[in-house]
Amino acid sequence: ADIVFVAVNWTKLPAALRGLPEWSGRIVIDANNPIEAPLFKPVDLNGRVSSDVVADLVTGARVVKAFNHLRAEVLASDPRSGGGRRVLFYSGNDGTAKAEVAALIEKIGFVGIDLGPLAVGGKLMQFPGGPLPNQNLIKIN
């Protein structure tokens, strides 16, 4: 696949990603947060952004952080709401990869907002710690 979603319990990431085909050039959408479910216990990343940790596990992939700041039931609901469309944030270091993820976000009915590189946007939408998790925002048409 050209675009791969990664949404796995944080401590299971290394095992889930081990032994998979070459990542080179693929887009990996990091939909993870550094918590241990179901207790929502934060994982200490020593000041790193979680997407940097994911990038280390998918060498050569173009990582875009997205689909992680809203609960699953909100993501599964109709993106049209209150006279507008629900907002999804994304960030990444590769402009072409971000453009492809933005197109996917639009195609499924959401409004995408680019938060810049992973070092900035990843921190903004990372749970815990960022100000954007669970912010269910609507862009009015």
Model-derived features: positions:
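Rossmann-like NAD(P)-binding element
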Residues: 1-38
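Generic secondary-structure signature for well-ordered alpha-helical cores
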Residues: 3-6, 59, 106-113
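Short beta->alpha connector loops
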Residues: 9-12, 69-71, 94-96
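Short, hinge-like loop/turn segments at secondary-structure boundaries
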Residues: 23, 46-47, 80-84, 130-133
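Rossmann-fold NAD(P)-binding glycine/threonine-rich loop
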Residues: 32-80
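Active-site-lining helix/loop region of Rossmann-like oxidoreductase modules
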Residues: 85-141
